[in-house]
From Swiss-Prot:
GO terms (BP aspect): anterograde axonal protein transport; anterograde dendritic transport of neurotransmitter receptor complex; axon guidance; cellular response to ethanol; cellular response to nerve growth factor stimulus; cerebral cortex development; hippocampus development; microtubule-based process
Organism the protein comes from: Rattus norvegicus
Protein's UniProt name: Kinesin heavy chain isoform 5A
InterPro entries (alphabetical): Kinesin-like_fam, Kinesin_motor_dom, Kinesin_motor_dom_sf, P-loop_NTPase
Gene Ontology cellular component annotations, sorted alphabetically: apical dendrite; axon; axon cytoplasm; central region of growth cone; ciliary rootlet; cytoplasm; dendrite; dendrite cytoplasm
Main localization of the protein described in the UniProt heading: cytoplasm
Reported tissue expression: Expressed in brain.
Gene this chain is encoded by: Kif5a
EC number: 5.6.1.3
Length: 1027
């Protein structure tokens, strides 16, 4: 809700930069002539502004003259805008930003960041601030977020008050000037810049830095909000001077187009006669709509070049500033009424309406009496205040001129009465006017009430709609999660099915390949059987080829077996031409390599056994640590017993004191009885009255002293009893935690023991598998010898067959009548060879099957060995983690005990700092900033280091006070590990101007870096330790 409207003009300031090096070398003239602080003459024409800055003006002078007041206005609840306009290379970015981290050359934006927090530190401590910033640019007429480069085309929308804003822009909560500068650095690194003939760092976009400040008074619940737009506009360009081309030329076109739209808006506002202002022609003017003729206090910098080379552009810029100076803004405080304030306002208006209705009823009654001819006495007429109120709200009522009373009177009296009647009619007319005005006011209030009710109903409807949408989105989110789970399950099932089907396809393809091989062999055998005797030589050649194929198959199997074991693949010969013995020699060599691989597997099994022994040893170490934890628990139990005995002693003292109190009460009663007796006696003895009064006063004073001492002693004992009871409760809780941790460690120990047993069983199983592997190796050796014998037999048969064929060919010419007998013997030999070939094929198949079985067994064995090794590593890691967890728990428990003791002693020392609070919401993945809702937050790693060091030093000091601990020293002799964080912490406090951090609204422990004396550091602790 906006209140306190006031009209103000746009504040226009002109700043000239010095001549640059290129202009000096070119010989350009310095054309501006300055007259006073508010005017400049260019070409004989004066231009007047709110302030004109010559080239020698410093950044600090510019800031104090124009921007300092706008910071106060924003903190008071107004909206503010500062933007720079001008030609390219005229000093706009230098004016707005400058060098961010240079105290002398920093521009308006960093100085405003520091000034905001300086003002906040000096404001009322009941105020709470929320400050968030946004940084975006308008590049090629698209809004681009400089803090999130993935957001490249944001849109402009309007809120419920029809104020434009950029939807989806990143907002960062900040709590110090340094955080604002970090945000500016981050955004500035993402901004578009280019090199032109006039500027080495020419801005190619309009950048807008938005600071949104919300403040709330915690006591009155009054809320104010203010926005500050800090815009650095890109400069207008003349392509013939900048030399822009390509992408830079397109950027220049868009820049000039948006600046032209800005000029059209300012021209329309300056004329004041146009009903339409083209805010929507450009996204820049759309965003700055409230700054130009709206609810905002706006300051415009027009930056100019003093060179005669840029004479035309400078004059155009100055004319632009003069038009902007005539624009009027209506600034108002952005005040948000709370529900309680709305309710009070409603009740106030309701009471006012009720009073007005009562006044109207009285006026109507009085009017009806006047119209009926009655004379209303002065006492019954409305008072002056009521008449004035009625005059504001009454409606106009027609006057009845007919009198219902006819009286016979004299002419003088008649004239007198007519004058009286005319006067009364005049009063009636006045009353009618008052009634008319009051009725109009009532209607206006009724309309306001209806508007408020409609607003309340619409707000409730919007709230319900948002709730429904939220529930709908929640349900959709849950449904989407369920769908994702179902899809993941379906994908897992598909993956499992795919793996199974792939394995089945591989098995079927292998079987198909075996069948094809067997079919080809059978076809070859059939062809050899159907061939004629005269082709026996060709049959011999086929037999050699088949022998070579068998050898190649055997070599392939050996190669695959070697790959599985890990020796690499055997390089097969391209063609086997007769040296079969050499091939067998190669096979034997690779079989010996496989044997060496098997030996390496045995060596790995032995290493696993050694690892098992190491795991046993580590488990024993864990058992010893467990026993140490049990000893610590017993020590804590002994502490609890000693405290219990101390409590019993305190109870006994309390009982004695109560008994003494009772005896003193009895004595008091006796003394009172004696006093009564003395009073009776005093009546008889008047001369002794003065002495008795003095005795009585002395006795009363003595009793009062006894009573006060007794009460003090009782209060002190009660406090000690409460403190000891709290300590006992905390120690009991700690003991329960230690018991739980002990049970957890025992469970982990049992689990590790079970895992060790399982590992032993798996190792035995691996040993059994290794023995089976050795047996398979022996069987393979036997098969190898069998194959060698069969191949040797086949080789011999081939030689005999060749010799026999040669002999028969030689004798064929001499023994033609015996051809039939020779053919018969040849067929017998062919059948014999076929039988031998079948036997050899069976042997080969058996060898292949055995080789395949071994090939299947070996990966399983290797997989189990790898699983065992991984399990051993996992057990070692778990054991190490359990050991580290036990040590961490031990340290944490000790720290918890010391922290509880500290909390008891420093319970009443917390006080709020006398400065305004800057609240920053807490975010996941960051350390929360300090705020009224989280006063123990930290802002940097140095603060965490400082707190940890302070706590550890406090614990060390406590252990020094105890006679059983002498190992810790104070601040480790102020070592380098603790001085650096403390120095950075002290520097942060010095920069902020506070004794404590601006985000910390509590009283911390004394700073150990400021007072190295332990007696000054922890006086409370030392007093308690001494007592």
């Amino acid at each position: 809700m906006a209140e306190t409207n006031n009209e103000c003009s746009i504040k226009v300031l002109c700043r000239f930069r010095p001549l640059n090096q290129a202009e000096i070398l070119r010989g350009d003239k310095f054309i501006p002539i300055f007259q006073g602080d508010d005017s400049v003459i260019i070409g004989g024409k004066p231009y007047v502004f709110d302030r004109v800055f010559p080239p020698n003006t410093t950044q600090e002078q510019v800031y104090h003259a124009c921007a300092m007041q706008i910071v106060k206005d924003v903190l008071a609840g107004y909206n503010g805008t500062i933007f720079a306009y001008g030609q390219t290379s005229s000093g706009k970015t230098h004016t707005m930003e400058g060098k961010l981290h240079d105290p002398q050359l920093m521009g308006i934006i960093p100085r405003i960041a520091r000034d905001i927090f300086n003002h906040i530190y000096s404001m009322d401590e009941n105020l709470e601030f929320h400050i968030k910033v946004s940084y975006f640019e308008i590049y090629l007429d698209k809004i681009r977020d400089l803090l999130d480069v993935t957001k490249t085309n944001l849109s402009v929308h309007e809120d419920k008050n029809r104020v434009p804003f950029v939807r989806g822009c990143t907002e960062r909560f900040v709590s110090s000037p340094e955080e604002i500068l970090d945000v500016i650095d981050e955004g500035k690194s993402n901004r578009h810049v280019a090199v032109t003939n006039m500027n080495e760092h020419s801005s190619r976009s309009h950048s807008i830095f938005l600071i949104n400040i919300k403040q709330e008074n915690i006591e009155t619940e009054q809320k104010l909000s203010g926005k500050l737009y800090l815009a650095d506009l890109a400069g207008s360009e003349k392509v013939s001077k900048t030399g822009a081309e390509g992408a830079v030329l397109d950027e220049a076109k868009n820049i000039n187009k948006s600046l032209s739209a800005l000029g059209n808006v300012i021209s329309a506002l300056a004329e004041g006669t146009k009903s339409y202002v083209p805010y929507r022609d450009s996204k820049m003017t759309r965003i700055l709509q409230d700054s130009l003729g709206g609810n905002c206090r706006t300051t415009m910098f027009i930056c100019c070049s003093p060179s005669s080379y840029n004479d035309a552009e400078t004059k155009s810029t100055l004319m632009f500033g003069q038009r902007a100076k005539t624009i009027k803004n209506t600034a108002s405080v952005n005040l948000e009424l709370t529900a309680e304030q709305w309710k009070k306002k409603y009740e106030k208006e309701k009471e006012k309406t009720k009073a007005q209705k009562e006044t109207i009823a009285k006026l109507e009654a009085e009017l009806s009496r006047w119209r009926n001819g009655e004379n209303v006495p002065e006492t019954e007429r409305l008072a002056g205040e009521d008449s004035a109120l009625a005059a504001e709200i009454c409606e106009e009522t027609p006057v009845n001129d007919n009198s219902s009373i006819v009286v016979r009177i004299a002419p003088e009296e008649r004239q007198k009465y007519e004058e009286e009647i005319r006067r009364l009619y005049k009063q009636l007319d006045d009353k009618d006017d008052e009634i008319n005005q009051q009725s109009q006011l009532i209607e206006k209030l009724k309309q306001q009430m209806l508007d408020q009710e409609e607003l309340l109903v619409s707000t409730r409807g919007d709230n319900e709609k948002v709730q429904r949408e939220l529930s709908h989105l929640q349900s959709e989110n849950d449904a989407a999660k369920e769908e994702v789970k179902e899809v993941l399950q379906a994908l897992e099932e598909l993956a499992v099915n795919y793996d199974q089907k792939s394995q089945e396809v591989e098995e079927k393809s292998q079987q198909n390949q075996l069948l094809v091989d067997e079919l080809s062999q059978k076809v070859a055998t059939m062809l050899s059987l159907e061939s004629e005797p005269q082709r026996l030589q060709e049959v011999s050649g086929h037999q050699r080829k088949r022998i070579a194929e068998v050898l190649n198959g055997l070599m392939k199997d050996l190669s695959e077996f070697s790959v599985i074991v890990g020796n690499g693949e055997i390089k097969l010969p391209v063609e086997i031409s007769g040296a079969i013995e050499e091939e067998f020699t190669v096979a034997r060599l690779y079989i010996s390599k496989i044997k060496s691989e098997v030996k390496s597997v045995v060596k790995r099994c032995r290493q696993l056994e050694n690892l098992q022994v190491e795991c046993h040893r580590k488990m024993e170490v864990t058992g010893r640590e467990l026993s140490s934890c049990q000893l610590l628990i017993s020590q804590h139990e002994a502490k609890i017993r000693s405290l219990t005995e101390y409590m019993q002693t305190v109870e006994l003292k309390k009982r004695h004191l109560e008994e003494s109190y009772d005896s003193l009460s009895d004595e008091l009663a006796k003394l009172q009885a004696q006093e009564t007796v003395h009073e009776v006696a005093l009546k008889d003895k008047e001369p002794d009255t003065q002495d008795a009064e003095e005795v009585k006063k002395a006795l009363e004073l003595q009793m009062e002293n006894h009573r006060e001492a007794h009460h003090r002693q009782l209060a002190r004992l009660r406090d000690e009893i409460n403190e000891k009871q709290k300590t006992i409760d905390e120690l009991k809780d700690l003991d329960q935690k230690l018991q739980l941790e002990l049970e957890k460690l025992q469970a982990d120990y049992e689990r590790l023991k079970n895992e060790e047993n399982e590992k032993s069983a798996k190792l035995q199983e691996l040993t059994f598998l290794y023995e089976r592997h050795e047996q398979s190796k022996q069987d393979l050796k036997g098969l190898e010898e069998t194959v060698a014998r069969e191949l040797q037999t086949l080789h011999n048969l081939r030689k005999l067959f060749v010799q026999d064929v040669t002999t028969r060919v030689k004798k064929s010419a001499e023994m033609e009548p015996e051809d039939s007998g020779g053919i018969h013997s040849q067929k017998q030999k062919i059948s014999f060879l076929e039988n031998n070939l079948e036997q050899l094929t069976e042997v080969h198949k058996q060898l292949v099957r055995d080789n395949a079985d071994l090939r299947c067994e070996l990966p399983k064995l290797e997989k189990r060995l790898r699983a065992t090794a991984e399990r051993v590593k996992a057990l070692e890691g778990a054991l190490k983690e359990a050991k580290e967890g036990a040590m961490k728990d031990k340290r944490r428990y000790q720290q918890e005990v010391d922290r509880i003791k500290e909390a008891v002693r420093y319970k009443s020392s917390g006080k709020r700092g006398h400065s305004a609070q800057i609240a920053k919401p807490v975010r996941p993945g960051h350390y929360p900033a300090s705020s009224p809702t989280n006063p123990y937050g930290t802002r940097s790693p140095e603060c965490i280091s400082y707190t940890n060091n302070l706590f550890q030093n406090y614990q060390n000091l406590h252990l020094q006070a105890a006679p059983s601990s002498t190992s810790d020293v104070y601040f480790a002799s102020n070592g380098a590990t603790s001085v650096a964080p403390l120095a950075s912490y002290q520097k942060a406090n010095t920069d902020n101007g506070n004794a404590t951090d601006i985000n910390d609204n509590r009283s911390d422990l004394p700073c150990g870096y400021e007072a190295e004396d332990p007696a000054k550091l922890f006086p409370l602790h030392q007093e308690t330790a001494a007592s």
